[in-house]
C-alpha cells in the first residue's frame, strides 16, 4: 500500500530521509511532518478449554477448511478486549484468561495480526451466523485439521510447539 497524499491536508507527499528510521519516509511539506503508512490490526485466537487440552476451530465464508477465530480491532479498542469481544460475539463463550502468543504482518490484507490464547470457561458453543461450522479438537487433531499453508496454521503450530515460523501463505 502506498500513500501519495497527506491525510491531514491533502498535499502531495514527497520522500524525505528520516534520521531515526534510517530511510526515506513520505513527508508533507505543508504540515512539516512525516506520514507513516497506515495498516489494519486484527486479533486471532487459539480458543481452548481451561485444561488447554481442547482447541476450537471454525469454518467461515463458505470455505471447507478449519481456521482460528479472528476479527479486526475496533477504533479505540485494545487488543485484549477485541479477543474477548470476538470470542463472545462469534461463539457466545466467556473468556476467563487472555495470553499474547505472537504477531505477524500479513501483506495480502495489509494487516498486523496479533495472536492470543483465549481460555474459556465452557465448551458449550452457540455460534452466530458468521460461523459455518465449528469443532473442538484435541491438540493433535487441531494440528492435523487446521488449514494448511495459512496464517491460522502457522499460529496454531507456534502455540503447540512454542516456535513460530511463518511461510508464504494464501490467507
Report residues per predicted region.
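Conserved Nudix-box catalytic region and its N-terminal flanking loop in Nudix hydrolases
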Residues: 48-89
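Short secondary-structure boundary/capping segments
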Residues: 17, 46-47, 58, 125-128
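Acidic, metal-coordinating catalytic segment for phosphate/diphosphate chemistry
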Residues: 2-45
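Short, Lys/Arg-enriched, disordered terminal segments
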Residues: 1-3, 164-171
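Residues embedded in well-ordered beta-strands
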Residues: 44-46, 54-56, 115-117
